[in-house]
Amino acid sequence: MTSSANQPFLAAIQLFVDGSKQEIEEAVRRTGIKILGRLVDMSPVGQPEIWQVNQTASAYNTAVREHNAALRDDPANLTKAGRLRRGLRVNDSMDIKRPEGYVGGRFKNNWYVGLDSQPTETNDIPDASGQGSNSRGLAVLEVFRVGQVNSIYFTNNLPYAQALENGHSNQAPGGMVGLTALDAAQYFREAMSEVRNGR
């Protein structure tokens, strides 16, 4: 049993512990937000123009654009108004192949955060900004509490996620998760400093 003389001291300790818990919770939330933000930012967005199947078409279209631009460099090809003379411009291109209705950004919008269990869901909504992933993750991280959560998972469950992590995309040749994991401790240090300095 504690004496009443110790109550103020114990209350001060409890206040410190509660304050420290709140700081840690906020630092963990901020760290999670930094990790998720980096994963989303590094996530490639499908660009059919750079797909292997479209390399010939893309190269041809670029050559046509460059040819037309070169024509403009010769003053003999221009009218008095500075426009390209009729009949000189090449009006040709090859179609870029893509699945019907394809819009890039599905992978970027499929990052999920889970507390103590790995998320299993996916969605079919393209979002090249990644705002959907960030919003969902923030909502999960907001409920993080010290002592109630042992693990935080960052997951992208699309079937091609592993291929992208293994460098399948020129936009993210080193993947996303491995590189972000290397910086996780630094993100925590930054977040802890922000919390302690009231930023």
Report each predicted region and the residues it spans.
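Short, Lys/Arg-rich flexible segments
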Residues: 1-199
